[in-house]
Amino acid sequence: MEQPSDSAPVYARRIMGIETEYGITASASNGQRVMSPDEIARVLFRPIVSKYSSSNIFSPNASRLYLDVGSHPEIATAECDSLSQLIAYERAGDAMVNRMAVQAEETLADEGEKRAVYLFKNNVDSAGNSYGCHENYLIGRHVVLKDLGKALLPFMITRQLICGVGMIRPAKGDDPACFVLSQRADQVWEGVSSATTRSRPIINTRDEPHGDSKRFRRMHVIVGDSNMAEPTMALKVGSTLLMLEMLEAGFEVPNLSVLEPIQHIRAIALDPTGRTELPLEGGGSTTALAVQQELCTAAERWLEHREEAGTPTTELARVVDLWKRTLQAIDTQDFSSVDREIDWVIKRSLLNRYRDRLGGDWAHPKLAQIDLTYHDIRPGRGLYSVLEQRGMVERWIDDAAIDAAIDTAPQTTRAKLRGEFLAVARELDAAVTVDWTRMKVNRPEPMTEEFSDPFVSEDPRLDGLLDYMRSHPGS
């Protein structure tokens, strides 16, 4: 069997994070005026701005909360170093912004405007505007990101088969409304580049490591959907972790370089059978399903070689099992083995039940409403949330892990240092400034430390900052 190379570090324990932007709206009834997303967002962030004089803060769990361009609330999770930990903090982000929405409803009611505030964890609004779910993976500085990105492109353009959230794509010209696998496939136009909005790439190459730039880079993946189902999220991130480990190790991964890969991503989204034909650079062709099958087989072999660090190999074996079952379901078109785990399968099944009653037309407005409601993050109101509460979908983590992540930073990474710093600053009402790598006590005289290693969760320099704060209470 193939043996990993010793030529470069393989990050079995890898720093990761997810950035989630939320769509926002509010109900309007009984002659109420329609509130713009900007107005709703201002009400949503009013308590944050009142407390911190900013709409861009680090929360108690060391995640970043801010108002992004287009009036989208966004949470960037704190640094995580294992799969289940990352899912817990991503779900904690949902809970945090939901709390803000509930508070915004109370504020509006106090002002005589009783209405519901909705936050949607999706990627496209009714006007066709797109907002993202961005994945971040630490890689070594020695890695040429464009080369790594090129090697990953066949995986990335076909990954929607296993982890797309699905959506009804409205009619376009002569093309009727239809169900597609991914909400982001129509929104990316390049493979690997430094752009983010004008011509969104699959992988962004801007050099912002949020750490020691001599040692680390950050791979920023823009193409992914915002998942509601925890197992789908685990498959999206877990399969990507395995791909990165194999490529870093020089493990034998099939050469599946696709000719003009970005040209095929939209065709793949239209085909839930995975039979979309992909021409190969070396001649011949393959299919989207075959690409995923070959990479899944390689990942299963890799499990026998990987170092036991970060995400446990037993958990990644669960990822590979779900990966295999999903590909088998696509191959046979019998989805009964994954219809409680894979987002697009769950959503399509729900929509098909209603579509049959409504005459089979994907353009029916009732279906668009169901599609959107799937992504409402309010417990007991959002459609996916109701399925989860009724035990009709599978979980990857439990509620206790999410609850613990709402107010406590990850304890295994640099986020722990930031969380402790923020906790003491809140306790002492100290004026501080924080970003991903720096912590600064502003008064009486500025004192700053930079923490450039995201893997380190203990550092005596933090004690110096905390002692300085405590010796100048109220400064």
UniProtKB/Swiss-Prot annotation:
GO terms for molecular function: ATP binding; ligase activity, forming carbon-nitrogen bonds; magnesium ion binding; ubiquitin-like protein transferase activity. It catalyses: ATP + [prokaryotic ubiquitin-like protein]-L-glutamate + [protein]-L-lysine = ADP + phosphate + N(6)-([prokaryotic ubiquitin-like protein]-gamma-L-glutamyl)-[protein]-L-lysine. Mg(2+) binds at E19, Y66, E74. The active site is at D68 (proton acceptor). Keywords: ATP-binding, Ligase, Magnesium, Metal-binding, Nucleotide-binding, Ubl conjugation pathway. ATP binds at R64, T77, W436. GO terms for biological process: modification-dependent protein catabolic process; proteasomal protein catabolic process; protein pupylation. Pathway: Protein degradation; proteasomal Pup-dependent pathway; Protein modification; protein pupylation. Transmembrane segments: none annotated. Its EC number is 6.3.1.19. Pfam families: Pup_ligase (PF03136). The reaction mechanism probably proceeds via the activation of Pup by phosphorylation of its C-terminal glutamate, which is then subject to nucleophilic attack by the substrate lysine, resulting in an isopeptide bond and the release of phosphate as a good leaving group. Belongs to the Pup ligase/Pup deamidase family. Pup-conjugating enzyme subfamily. Catalyzes the covalent attachment of the prokaryotic ubiquitin-like protein modifier Pup to the proteasomal substrate proteins, thereby targeting them for proteasomal degradation. This tagging system is termed pupylation. The ligation reaction involves the side-chain carboxylate of the C-terminal glutamate of Pup and the side-chain amino group of a substrate lysine. This is Pup--protein ligase. It comes from Corynebacterium aurimucosum (strain ATCC 700975 / DSM 44827 / CIP 107346 / CN-1) (Corynebacterium nigricans). The lineage of its organism: Bacteria, Bacillati, Actinomycetota, Actinomycetes, Mycobacteriales. The gene is pafA.
